[in-house]
Amino acid sequence: MLHLFLFSSAASTTTAVEDNSTTMPPSSRSAANQNSSSSLHLCKHSPSATLDLLILILVLFSGTFLLSSYFSYLIHSLSLLSSHFPSITISLSSLLPPLIIFFSSDHSTEDEDHHHPSGKIPPPASFFFAFAVFFAASIAFLDLCCGSRSRKCRNPKCKGMKKAMEFDLQLQTEECVKSGSVKEIDRLPWKGGSESNPDYECLRAELRKMAPVNGRAVLIFRSKCGCPIAKLEGWGPKRSRRHKKSPAKLAVKGCIDNR
């Protein structure tokens, strides 16, 4: 009886789930399918990210080991050289005191271990120091190669954007053109080499349609860092302003007419 009861309860739950899935609207079904697919899509890329992290750690430790060995050999060679030239010892001690302390202690313990096989393990101070130096150097190298400084151009006002917009459209009124705030845009070269390049006549015609009265529409082309490099412009229709007559002039004109 217990088995029959469990089987009937399981069947009822499955039928209830099926009924709920059939009664769901199509929009909710699509949203659920998108969520499940996105979760699966994210889970597919997680092993590769873990592998990349492990590779980065291995590269850092291997570089640290090589750098520590290089510094150990360098300091050991300089110590041997300074024994023959005492003047070099003073300059080295004033320039590189931490390195001499770390690596000379490391080599002294290594020499003691060679003479005394039962000696202690050398202190890992040089290893940690080399790891810190290599880590700082790698961060500085990445900042120089991939940071905002590497993306900056010769313009001193460059912001060093990563992926700036390729072009920018500006609608300038008559007051804006006369104000002198667009001098930087006026200095830009023309797209195509000259203002009357026939390859860009269609764009200039569209700019003329969008330009305000007595103003202009300027299409500014930008580089990846965001700095403007070229321009296209189209002027709007020219209309003269109607000057309003002052009340004094109207009064004088009325007096003349009455006479």
UniProtKB/Swiss-Prot annotation:
Main location: membrane
Transmembrane segment boundaries: 55-75, 85-105, 127-147
Keywords: Membrane, Transmembrane, Transmembrane helix
Topology with respect to the bilayer: Multi-pass membrane protein
One Gene Ontology CC term in the entry: membrane
Subcellular location as annotated: Membrane
InterPro entries in the cross-refs: At5g19025-like (IPR044196)
Membrane recorded as keyword: yes
UniProt key word Hydrolase: no
Listed name of the protein: Uncharacterized protein At5g19025
Native source organism of the sequence: Arabidopsis thaliana (Mouse-ear cress)
